[in-house]
Amino acid sequence: MFLSFCGKVPRNEGAAFVAPNATVQGDVILKAGSTVWYGAVLRGDDGQLIIGENSNVQDNAVLHCDVGGAVTLGRNVTVGHSALVHGCTVGDGSLIGMHATLLNHCVVGKNCIIGAGALVPEGMVIPDGSVAVGVPAKVIKQVSPRSEEHTS
């Protein structure tokens, strides 16, 4: 469902799929080939959300930001089931695991894997090609070439 908020209207810039019970509200841009699955909530009421080409936001995930903030997902990003992505940037080809939480101003580099249930604290920077897990998240290794094939 697409909802306007204070004059801000979501934009579908190229055949993005949005499940019937997903909510996309306010200043949200869905790039070509992106998908938003069942129960997901994308709230662009306080800042802009950009969902990159061929990225997917899976069931029950929530994307939001504080006033003046933004959420930017690069191309080919996967946001896992029930993840919370709040006011941050995720680089191309990265995977955000199920139930992971990304807080304000954190940056996840390109081709990263954030483990299921991980908490990426406010302002943390995860370098390109990293695997980060835990609460709080810690980088434990670099993505293997085989894993990188699946994230890019």
Predicted regions and their residues:
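Short Gly/aromatic-enriched secondary-structure transition segments
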Residues: 33-34, 51
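N-terminal glycine-rich anion-binding loops that anchor highly charged ligand groups
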Residues: 25-31
